[in-house]
Amino acid sequence: MLEIIYKDTDIVIIRKPYGLDCQYQIPQFLKQQLNCDIYTVHRLDTIVTGVMVFCLNQKSAAILSKEITEKVFKKEYLAIIEGCFKEQQNRLTDLLFHDKRANKTYVVKKKRKGVKEALLEYRQLCSINNNSLLLIRLLTGRTHQIRVQLASRSHPIIGDGKYGSNDNGKIQLFCYHISFVHPANQMVMDFKLLPNQSLLFDTFKNHLKEGELCEKY
């Protein structure tokens, strides 16, 4: 059973578990669990966990998809990286190319067919034992964007072997916060989750208090 955080007649909010893809597996499980159609409007990588919204009808899905395109839909992540940035906060801008065959994204220098601009903002909350906890605001939604933008600056996410981490454990990337306008009643919907027990995230638990995180931006 998937953990449901909130549900109404138009949307359902869940805690996405590790190892399930959000395009096929999670919609199928939710359909069985809720006995209704499920529509995916945004994605998290299979190996990434965190808060997600799914729609329960086509109209709501179309409205939320438009919010994502128009950047009304907001997403923030927590990540633990190798090393630390010199700048405590910054905006990262890159050109990315996604190789579909290899399922890998690369930072490139020049604009060409298939290349897209990627932007994110981060704030470095603290550093312990040469690892750092980041709060990340995603400004564009490119494939593997956070992972490759951090790795390209020699700060791969812990556990992300695909992009250079030496750690073989689970990736330490968590979708912490989503915010959007409800597709039916136009109310602002705001959902925050903290990671479940994780040895690395527990190391930073004093900095993972929701009130403190809310003040970081």
Q: Locations of the language-model features?
A:
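RNA pseudouridine synthases
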Residues: M1-L119, C126-N129, Q172, S198-H207, ...
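A short beta-strand motif that forms part of the nucleic acid-binding face
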Residues: Y18, N57-Q58, I68-T69, L138-T140, ...
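Pseudouridine synthase
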Residues: L30, H98, I128-F180
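Short beta-strand segments
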Residues: D94, A118-L120, H144, M187-F191
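Residue-level recognition of short loop/turn positions
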Residues: R101-A102, T140, A184-N185
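Beta-rich strand-turn-strand
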Residues: R142-T143, D190, P195-F201
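Long, intrinsically disordered, low-complexity Ser/Thr/Pro-rich regulatory/activation regions
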Residues: H177-P195
